[in-house]
Amino acid sequence: MKRQFEDVTRIVIKIGTSSLVLPTGKINLEKIDQLAFVISSLMNKGKEVILVSSGAMGFGLDILKMEKRPTNLAKQQAVSSVGQVAMMSLYSQIFAHYQTNVSQILLTRDVVVFPESLANVTNAFESLISLGIVPIVNENDAVSVDEMDHATKFGDNDRLSAVVAGITKADLLIMLSDIDGLFDKNPTIYEDAQLRSHVAVITQEIIASAGGAGSKFGTGGMLSKIQSAQMVFENKGQMVLMNGANPRDILRVLEGQPLGTWFKQIEEVTHD
């Protein structure tokens, strides 16, 4: 099945902490610059782009000179709060080099659950996009809670990006990660693991093969990416999971090159 993205106008791009923060804990400035260039190029071609960006914790750890993520929730929220400001400041500066304006939208799950607040945030997205601004979305870590009686967390930004793609009716979700896509088995263990180029149905076998948590700076593992693809399918959308090592590969993907894994349901043909 050939990839055809000519009709794609609205794109949600999700970038994870592992793509923004080097293994040393330092910020990957080159990667952020490349990402800003690619998004600005797409905007200049008439595309509408929303960026879902992790990284608040990684930025916070770097600024506060902390080597590892705190185990205490209040400290985690404090570090993320510091990091979010630094991350947005850097995004704003770098995007400005490409004459692109950005905005910040911080979400919690209850915002998209209640109809009134969902309508408000949907209108905010539409207004920003109509003004040629790139909304940069993250979860509001400083106030999100994950308690049984009042859970407001999305879980991680993989799922958040699928939610954003749904509420903005995006044509395509591109998920950048530190892996090349979805394999038939764990490529870090099995040398003969094969990359799945196209997934039309998310089977129990695929779900079972997706195990393990994320990086030390982030939270999302392969399972959350599969769950995100399921959410995208529920909204009749499509998603590409690809390596974020070179953000310019986004342009190649949109040209139809078979990078990463394309999650796209096969439409049933009805005969009269």
Swiss-Prot record:
The residues listed in the UniProt record as binding substrate, with positions renumbered to this chain, are: 54, 141, 157
Sorted alphabetically, which keywords does the UniProt record give?
A: Amino-acid biosynthesis, ATP-binding, Cytoplasm, Kinase, Nucleotide-binding, Proline biosynthesis, Transferase
In which domain of life is the source organism classified? Bacteria
Might you name a Gene Ontology BP term for this protein? L-proline biosynthetic process
Which pathway, metabolic or otherwise, does it act in? Amino-acid biosynthesis; L-proline biosynthesis; L-glutamate 5-semialdehyde from L-glutamate: step 1/2
A GO MF term: glutamate 5-kinase activity
Could you say which enzyme class this protein belongs to?
Answer: transferase
Q: Name one GO cellular component term.
A: cytosol
Q: What is this enzyme's catalytic activity, as reactions? A: L-glutamate + ATP = L-glutamyl 5-phosphate + ADP
Q: Where are the transmembrane segments?
A: none
What's the stated role of this polypeptide?
Catalyzes the transfer of a phosphate group to glutamate to form L-glutamate 5-phosphate.
Give the record's family classification: Belongs to the glutamate 5-kinase family.
What is the protein's given name?
A: Glutamate 5-kinase
Organism source for this protein? Streptococcus pyogenes serotype M28 (strain MGAS6180)
Taxonomic lineage from the root = Bacteria, Bacillati, Bacillota, Bacilli, Lactobacillales
